[in-house]
Amino acid sequence: LELAGNCGMSFCAPVQGAAVEQSEQRWQMYGPDIALNQPENTLHWKSFGDYLDTLDSKGSTLNIASQVGHGTIRAGVIGFDDRAPTVDEIASMETLVSESLDAGALGFSTGLFYAPGSYARTDEIVVLAGVAAKKNKLYSTHMRDESNYSISLLGSIEESIAIGRLSGVRVQISHLK
């Protein structure tokens, strides 16, 4: 099983806004035409469900599962702006997380060390992780800090635990060192 979508980046989907260029660059770099029998290196889907349908119809040599990445969703809705989302933007992100989980994403992931995930405040993640909690899905996080760059290792662990407690989601800390 190949698990994609870790650390907040699910370059496969959902793809919209600023996430389109970022995802197309990744796909061109890694050659999806070979894996998905595509005639050219372009994305032929926008939603998570469309991506999974493409895998089913084109076939894949790998058994692929994916989480839906916060960074991809945030880039698609807000771009790479270092700011809090508006009420409408957070609602759009909730919808994308929900639709992706309903379509087959195994969970919701964040990469809070990397832009654009690093621009998100804890309350934004609590709301979006709450969507995963309601669907009994996992939340995995590449924490905000693993040293002393911003909030420290212990601060990052505390933030991860708080997200779980406040949202009710199961938490997996990726790369705990």
Regions found by a protein language model. Name each.
Residues 49-52, 56, 84-110, 116-177:
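Histidine/acidic residue-rich metal-binding segments in metalloenzymes
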